[in-house]
């Protein structure tokens, strides 16, 4: 599911969102994509109830606003829904905490995305490959 955030309400931003949804549909025809306005909570919740994945690609819940979330209706969470987050600070967002409390079994935080962005940035800045396995051991150590 892809949801449109009103932070950047330009035609270019909207076009980009729709193009990404179309590209995803072409790459994975069996994957249904839905673009909806985050301000329409009824549509958002109905869409989540029909989805296999909920991925927050906004900054809602990121420090210093850790107590914010896009989801205020806990009934949309279910055990088999996969909940993912691109935010890595805080490590566990309110959305992730709420999903866990509601019984969601598969919850993924944003540290993996941060790691792989770092891999690409390292290569861009140094021209060398980052020692990913070494960094993973340090980065994901509890």
Give the residues covered by each predicted segment:
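Glycine-rich phosphate/diphosphate-binding loop of Rossmann-like nucleotide-binding domains
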Residues: 1-49, 53
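Surface-exposed, flexible loop/turn segments at secondary-structure boundaries
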Residues: 7-8, 62, 115
């Amino acid at each position: 599911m892809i949801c449109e955030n009103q932070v950047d309400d330009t035609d270019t931003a909207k076009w980009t969102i729709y193009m990404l949804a179309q590209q995803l549909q072409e790459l994975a025809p069996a994957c249904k994509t839905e673009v909806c306005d985050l301000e329409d909570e009824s549509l958002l919740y109905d869409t989540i109830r029909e989805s296999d994945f909920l991925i927050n690609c906004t900054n809602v819940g990121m420090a210093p606003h850790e107590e914010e979330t896009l989801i205020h209706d806990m009934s949309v969470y279910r055990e088999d829904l996969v909940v993912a987050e691109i935010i890595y600070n805080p490590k566990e967002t309110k959305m992730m905490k709420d999903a866990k409390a509601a019984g969601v079994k598969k919850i993924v935080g944003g540290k993996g995305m941060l790691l792989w962005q770092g891999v690409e940035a390292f290569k861009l800045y140094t021209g060398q490959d980052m020692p990913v396995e070494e960094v993973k051991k340090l980065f994901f150590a509890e």
